[in-house]
């Protein structure tokens, strides 16, 4: 019985083609032909997709990968279909990448679809998209069926159009939840054929009596017996007009008593709803028995395929340590404020008064001849002017007046005062001296200093005269015998002439010389 059913399916599906192609189309259309996919282990979850989702998946099937046009793996020796994993990969990719967002609306279903795709890739591995296939001709090739050779001499063929459609339908059936499917229900509205909007102008309260159509009255000139066939069968309400024809005047009068005030309504739309329901059913045996019929072999072969589908869940925990460093740059704005307040007030007042009293001078007697001469010379000391001349008798005290200036600076708060003293000098009148040597600046010395200075000058003068006299003595007139008389310093034997007297190298000091400087000039230590 199964063999007969298989043969009928081959004839109807292949359209008169070879027996091999027909049998292979049945196997390729089954998703369970792929060893890494088992539809029984997947719980259906799609329920929010439209019914034409399969058309979208078929339309974008060939655009997913380069191998989608030749995705069926074939045995090189027996020319049997080994698996359709690549075809199933193309269908899942078309559903996930190209059609789901346009035909489905649930985010939870999309997340479940991602899990199915990931599990399929883990089980079957990553399919190679860059594999180069070369065409290969054989006796099974035809205009619709082509074979290709890939790496390691693997043989592939293209899926036929009905094989691809059946594979997509079987895949969506295994993923669709039939109990919650609402994608097959389409609701639409049927609008009036003429697309006209009709208004309700006047009608009676009972709604049974309808007024004649306005267009009908205009076309028939008030003939009430004629009806326009194009308005039959439609529910339309038109504005009622007064009829001027005589044939309708009686009926109008009879109906005038039963009519009441007419109302105006909003426009109405007439819609109709059609519901189409489609149910999908499938038979899923636990074991699949596939019969392959090949012309070269007369004996049938029974192949039992065990499909395994593994679910692997991997949890990965990643610890991340974030180290950040922050650099801050501060700008310092120095602020310097200097407050200077100076207040100086100086007041200086000095008054100096100098009074010179009359100094009595006496004549000193100095012995100029150490050998006993009786010649004496008198020296008078008095007060003289700065130029060495005697002061005039009429010269009295001369006052000197000096101004006092005051300098004031308001900004520095400093006040200075400069004082110039006023000095009154008075020189007494002294008698005029006739002889003697005069020494200037004696008016600045008191009595004791003056006497000490005079004695010092006298002693120094005598010593210098003694040395000078000793050095000027000539010994050429005396002999050795006269050596006893060398110590004889009697006055009778020594005579002094004017050549033995000469002036000392002592300069006359000016007015205002100090005592130390005067002693230095005189040679007194």
Curated annotation (Swiss-Prot):
Residues 22-448 are extracellular. It is found in: Membrane. Residues 1-21 form the signal peptide. Residues 470-525 are cytoplasmic. Its main location: membrane. The chain crosses the membrane at residues 449-469. One of its GO terms (cellular component) is mitochondrion. Keywords: Membrane, Signal, Transmembrane, Transmembrane helix. The keyword Coiled coil does not apply. It is a single-pass type I membrane protein. Residues 242-264 are annotated as: Disordered. This is Uncharacterized protein YKR005C. It comes from Saccharomyces cerevisiae (strain ATCC 204508 / S288c) (Baker's yeast).
